[in-house]
């Protein structure tokens, strides 16, 4: 639609809009009211009368211009409605034609669907145009295509993104398509079969069905009835598919729906395209409910029950969701412009200055890790140097040389590291230090498992140096030493050994070799490849991978520590007991760790839990709701260990707590990823009942007071234990990111934020009424009383400071949204102040703008507007498609919260860690907003 405005300071202003549709001409003229005019105004429109109508022949005789007959319609355009003022022929006579009466009646109806588009005079005229075209289509005239230019209209920009090939599927262009055509058609004499069309144009295998429908639509328009095409025909197909114009895109989509090519879309055809789109996006729920959604579209676009809709009706539906995307796109562009200068990478010309800045940024972001590592490395260096100098002054140095110094120096570091490697896994101690002291501000407790792994590497290096120095240097020198040189060694080794075997078969040799073998087994099975089951072996060796293998192999260290003490007591060269220091290094850590294990066993036995509810969700997720032991206190973001004797009496596995501290129960959501979790799901599935007819398709079982209850397996819990996410209350603004089942700690935080906000409201109401804090508020937020009294623990982490939370949940499957549907709805309903901004991303759905998700986007907007429920997630939270643009996420938060300190908490696959952390560093360095990145570690 083309708009023209003529402004002159001394003349009355008029506004005219003209739209040319084939041979039909519609012109609008009237006073210019402008987009801000609230009074409305009258608009006149002249429309060509189809020759097939009565008025086109009777009234047109005296009103023809350029061989066309016109009818003049005067409209009263107001803020939210369009009313017909009069309908006359061009000659001025009133019209009584039945069709025009129907036209007038239709124009007087308010458009519910298009209400969001009616923003100014121009958009109101466009609405009228749509209604006129829809009613004119009752004359069953052919729909002309490609005859009008919308390149400057808002609709063109909104629908420019209706791409039929995603960025990843078809961005290579015609050259790549032509190359694939030549490869595919080499054995078929230059003809491309329908089944290979999707592959040829770059679509993946999962879109094969969609590609077939696209082929049929393109072939129908060209009257191609064969199941194969040549290169010239493929070029025509590609030109239409790759065409960015509004009309080509819309017409292609219409052709895909209108399979019988009669120019109308029936409910059956709508149902088919919904099923096709749902299948392409792996949305099984929508596919099952295609009848319901097809009926919803027909109800909205066919209010007169004609049994079909035209392309204009489809266009109106298409305009809804993409228009929102245009707004979001504009916002994104504004964000980019506002931060472009700050985020623009500028190369520092001086390499020394560049290096200094990088180094200072590194220290600023990692100073906690740096000082701990420097202290640890410094202690190892001191111990190694001390032992080296000590043995250099002994008689053994004259025989074995520097080798004995290297071996003993490495041994001293091994003793240190075998002692401190236990400290990072003393979870109760670490949790107590996090909660009760201020050490968390200086000690990176979040990196406890990473430090544990680093120490393990240092032990491996120490063992290698110690063993190789003895086996390849010290022992051969003792065997080959002369009698005179060996004489000082008789006191330590006895008579000079005659063979290498003498050293190996001794207590020192046997214990050393066994320790190395056991350590190698434990280290190997603890690597990500074995622990996560990425390595597969044939039976019966398949049990050597997975978490069970890791868990049991790690307990070999009970034997290792026993042998280490024996090994340290049977030293050849050191005879005085008080100089054998192995037991001195190990005593305190071993006692501490043993105490932790005893505490875990004792605590789990006295704090029994009762299973209240079990549910098995899509995506192989088991939800366990348990009774809350008396006095059991925890923070959102923390985790606990779970043991089920029916699966394994000895294994304990960590899981994030998904309930909030204010809830009267405990809950965990466990995804089947390994052997133990698979067996656990099997055990609990056996006691669950299949869903009754018409109910949710979930396996579930509930504990009901006084009734026959299922025989639930016995479950023990141990915890809670500290985790990075528990510190979210220290930040006024938090960004919570969960990938798949990694949303579990974030869900607890979301619930806790809602409970805290609710408690604060209740507290304010109670204070206004002169009462103390209500019991409900205390239960919802146990820490609120401390905040009110300005008292907190030494850690200062109990006060609730969070004022804004952004929650991003990214999952691959639609069924995953069922895991926390109730919690998401509760949060959306209770968050009256808009504290929590929730975003669900379903990566199985093609990105916005891809035709395979175009109809899903339309359905989503229509259904959400009518019922407030998202069709993808089944919650009040509207879902997004494909993956988030994390850079834009950080941008928006940086703009919304300048000078703020934002806590970023992530739980999920390691692949995303690097990107999120790098964005946090970049935006912290280049904007006034500081992002603190935290990752969950188990």
Swiss-Prot record:
Q: What is this protein called?
A: Respiratory burst oxidase homolog protein C
List keywords of the entry alphabetically.
Calcium, Coiled coil, FAD, Flavoprotein, Membrane, Metal-binding, NADP, Oxidoreductase, Peroxidase, Phosphoprotein, Repeat, Transmembrane, Transmembrane helix
Q: Name one GO molecular function term.
A: peroxidase activity
* Residue stretches in coiled coil: 115-141
Function according to Swiss-Prot or TrEMBL: Calcium-dependent NADPH oxidase that generates superoxide. May be responsible for the oxidative burst in response to pathogen attack in the leaves.
> Start and end of every FAD-binding FR-type domain?
599-727
Residues spanning the signal sequence? none
């Amino acid at each position: 639609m083309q708009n023209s405005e003529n402004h002159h300071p001394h003349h009355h202003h008029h506004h005219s809009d003209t739209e040319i549709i084939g041979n039909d001409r519609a012109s609008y003229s009237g006073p210019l009211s402008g987009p801000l005019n609230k009074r409305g105004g009258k608009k006149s429109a002249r429309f060509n009368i189809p020759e097939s109508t009565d008025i086109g022949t009777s009234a047109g005789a005296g009103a023809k211009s350029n061989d066309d007959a016109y009818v003049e319609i005067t409209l009263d355009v107001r803020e939210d409605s369009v009313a017909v003022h009069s309908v006359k022929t061009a000659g001025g006579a009133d019209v009584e034609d039945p069709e025009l009466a129907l036209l007038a009646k239709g124009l007087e109806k308010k458009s519910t669907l298009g209400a969001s588009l009616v923003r100014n005079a121009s958009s109101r005229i466009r609405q009228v145009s749509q209604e006129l075209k829809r009613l004119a289509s009752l004359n069953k005239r052919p729909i002309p295509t490609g005859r009008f230019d919308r390149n400057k209209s808002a609709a063109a920009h909104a629908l420019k993104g209706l791409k039929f090939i995603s960025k990843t599927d078809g961005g290579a262009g015609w050259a790549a398509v032509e190359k694939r055509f030549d490869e595919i058609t080499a054995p078929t004499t230059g003809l491309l079969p329908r089944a290979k069309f999707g592959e040829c144009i770059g679509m993946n295998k999962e879109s094969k069905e969609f590609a077939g429908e696209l082929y049929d639509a393109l072939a129908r328009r060209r009257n191609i009835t064969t199941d194969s095409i040549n290169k010239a025909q493929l070029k025509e197909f590609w030109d239409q598919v790759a065409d960015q114009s509004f009309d080509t895109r819309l017409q292609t989509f219409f052709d895909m729906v209108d399979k019988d090519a009669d120019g109308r879309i029936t409910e059956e055809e709508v149902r088919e395209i919904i099923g096709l789109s749902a299948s392409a996006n792996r949305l099984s729920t929508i596919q099952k409910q295609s009848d319901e959604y097809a009926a919803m579209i027909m109800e909205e676009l066919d209010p007169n029950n004609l049994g079909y809709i035209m392309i204009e009706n489809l266009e109106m539906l298409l305009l809804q969701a993409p228009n929102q995307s245009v707004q979001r796109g504009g916002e994104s562009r504004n964000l980019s412009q506002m931060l472009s200068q700050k985020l623009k990478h500028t190369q520092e010309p001086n390499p020394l200055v560049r290096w200094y800045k990088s180094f200072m940024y590194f220290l600023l972001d990692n100073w906690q890790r740096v000082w701990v590592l420097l202290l640890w490395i410094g202690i190892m260096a001191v111990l190694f140097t001390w032992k080296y100098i000590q043995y250099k002054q002994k008689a053994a140095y004259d025989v074995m040389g520097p080798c004995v110094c290297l071996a003993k120096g490495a041994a001293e570091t091994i003793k240190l590291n075998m002692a401190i490697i236990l400290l990072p896994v003393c979870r109760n101690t670490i949790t107590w230090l996090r909660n009760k002291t201020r050490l968390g501000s200086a000690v990176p407790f979040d990196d406890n498992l990473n430090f544990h792994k680093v120490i393990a590497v240092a032990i491996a290096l120490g063992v290698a140096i110690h063993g190789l120095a003895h086996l390849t240097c010290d022992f051969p020198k003792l065997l080959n030493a002369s009698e005179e040189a060996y004489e000082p060694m008789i006191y330590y080794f006895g008579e000079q050994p005659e063979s290498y075997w003498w050293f190996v078969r001794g207590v020192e040799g046997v214990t050393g070799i066994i320790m190395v073998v056991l350590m190698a087994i434990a280290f190997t099975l603890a690597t990500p490849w074995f622990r996560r089951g990425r390595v597969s072996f044939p039976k019966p060796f398949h049990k050597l991978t997975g978490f069970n293998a890791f868990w049991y192999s790690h307990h070999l260290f009970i034997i290792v520590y026993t042998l280490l003490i024996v090994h340290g007591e049977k030293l050849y060269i050191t005879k005085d007991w008080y100089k054998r220091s192995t037991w001195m290094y190990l005593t305190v850590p071993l006692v501490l760790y043993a105490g932790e294990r005893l505490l875990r066993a004792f605590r789990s036995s006295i704090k029994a839990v009762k299973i209240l509810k079990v549910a098995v969700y899509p995506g192989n997720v088991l939800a366990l709701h348990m009774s809350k032991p008396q006095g059991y206190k925890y923070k959102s973001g923390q985790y606990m260990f779970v043991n089920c004797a029916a699966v394994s009496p000895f294994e304990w596995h960590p899981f994030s707590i998904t309930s909030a501290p204010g809830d009267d129960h405990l809950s965990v959501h466990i995804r089947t990823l390994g052997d133990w979790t698979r067996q656990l799901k099997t055990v609990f599935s056996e006691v669950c009942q299949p869903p009754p007819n018409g109910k949710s398709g979930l396996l579930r079982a509930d504990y009901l007071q006084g009734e026959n209850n299922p025989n639930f397996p016995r479950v023990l819990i141990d915890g809670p234990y500290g985790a990075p996410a528990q510190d979210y209350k220290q930040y006024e603004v938090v960004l919570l990111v969960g990938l798949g089942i990694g949303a579990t700690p974030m869900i607890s935080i979301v619930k806790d934020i809602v409970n805290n906000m609710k408690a604060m409201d209740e507290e304010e109401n109670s204070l206004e009424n002169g009462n103390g804090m209500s019991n409900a508020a205390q239960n919802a937020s146990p820490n609120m009383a401390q905040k009110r009294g300005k008292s907190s623990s030494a850690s200062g982490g109990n006060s609730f400071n969070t004022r804004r939370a952004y929650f991003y949940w990214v999952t691959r499957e639609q069924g995953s949204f069922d895991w926390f549907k109730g919690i998401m709805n509760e949060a959306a309903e209770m968050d009256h102040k808009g504290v929590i901004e929730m975003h669900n991303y379903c990566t199985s759905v093609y990105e916005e703008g891809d035709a395979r998700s175009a109809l899903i986007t339309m359905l989503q907007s229509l259904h959400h507007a009518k019922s407030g429920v998202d069709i993808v997630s089944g919650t009040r939270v509207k879902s997004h498609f494909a993956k988030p643009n994390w850079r834009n996420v950080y941008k928006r938060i940086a703009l919304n919260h300048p000078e703020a300190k934002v806590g970023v908490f992530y739980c999920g696959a390691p692949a995303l860690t690097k990107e999120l952390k790098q964005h946090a560093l970049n935006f912290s360095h280049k904007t006034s907003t500081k992002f603190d990145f935290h990752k969950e570690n188990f």
